[in-house]
Amino acid sequence: NPCLTFVTPTLLAGDRSQAHVVAHEIAHSWSGNLVTNLTWEHFWLNEGFTVFIERKIMHQLYGKSVFDFNAIGGLMELKETVDRLGATHPHTVLMPALEGGVDPDDVFSKVPYEKGFVFLVYLEHMASGRSDADADAANGTEAFAAFLKAHFERSKFGCVTSEGFRASYAEAFPEANEKVDWDTWLTAPGMPP
């Protein structure tokens, strides 16, 4: 079963302090297990999506303030990683180049998790067609959720790339896609634009 998740009983604490970890592992049922990245350059498609879904689950369970708190905490972790590596370090890009024998373990950091999450929040905002900061209103969120559901259904039991995801987004949200600087998001080092 590609969607089977094993969870140690220690994560099921009575105070629910580890609920985000359980939500993260459940989210991997879709991003990582049902659909996975073709190569390690596209690892953000596993972990960025998983963090995005995890935080959406937490939002449903505990409200927007928990979503915002976790998003801010993740952004702080991303900033710490970028500060530690350096704002121009090639391992701070969302889609790192791994040619020439670069070990994917050497690139492993918070970048695919948190920069990927921020990118997906941005894409969701752009899909809403709204210019204000409150784009998680029903229109954009529901349209993006439907898009992600279709993405996972179309790609199930397969592998995905950033280019393939970009093409799917462009097909679903052509006007929004025109405004997205994919190259900067995917290949520019440092913090998100």
PLM regions: where:
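Hydrophobic alpha-helical and helix-loop surface patches within well-folded domains
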Residues: 1-193
